Amino acid sequence: MIEVKDLNKSFGSFKVLDGLNIRVKKSSVYGLLGPNGAGKTTLIKHLAGIYKQDSGSILVNGEPVFENPAVKSSVAYISDDLYFFSQYSIDETARFYSTMYPKWNWKRYEQLKQVFPIDSGKRVTRLSKGMQKQVAFWLAICTMPEVMLLDEPVDGLDPVMRKKVWNLVLQDVAEREVCVMVSSHNLRELEDVCDHVGILHNGKIIVERELDNMKSDIHKIQVAYSGSIPENILSGEEILHRSQNGSVLLMIAKGDREKILAKIRESSPAILDILPLTLEEIFIYELGGIGYDIKN
């Protein structure tokens, strides 16, 4: 389990994390969203024990992670910027990992050779970026982690390998109750794997919800009228987005679904549809609602 309380971090005069609070349970996949510069990588590096916080607490399974080798040995971190020893083959890197991670599983390492079709005798740094990313997952999964921290984890992987990797991660979440935090700009992909989502903005989590609940609170509504579109159809509701194409009106509204629909029906529309809402749309319009200059 991950628990962060009142986390603060500055680099010089620039405050990156500002009183941040977050909690991720076992057997959960938490998607960390936010614009560039929001502090996502900084947060993940704190959780991995790379950075020391200015103030606040960071606990993994109830223990502080910074300068705590016992806790770090239960955490697998896959960075967006991978690093491997320049002269090591995959097998040599695996042997090094086995000395650093007490729960290293050689049986699993051999089994995963069927998933990752790479010659394990090859030097890692001579592999393509996509193959290096496969190696990173291969090794991380074999450490048998209790917590996985993934920063833009599947960049460079082809669609088939992405699916294989996520299947392995989700299998560990289900069978070993692994706690996963993943930061990615591929919102469509996060939508398929995450059960909780947090939006990071200016060093704080501004929205944190179960993904299903988040979708139930924001609605994409298409309305058509036989004549002109009435004014102020949802004047009493929070409208995150509104666009018009002829007699068809598209709205993104936040609030109670039944109350919103009842209000719209008062204007006697010819057509009233609720459309599927993607995580990407939720992200855009939630941020748009707090002053982001996002154009469509």
Residue ranges and their predicted role:
Residues 5, 25, 224-226, 254, ...:
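A structural detector for beta-sheet-dominated domains
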Residues 89, 210, 275-278:
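Short loop/turn segments at beta->alpha junctions
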Residues 148-149, 153, 228-232, 258-261:
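Short, surface-exposed beta-strand/loop "edge" segments at domain boundaries and coil↔beta transitions
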Residues 252-296:
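C-terminal coupling/interaction segments
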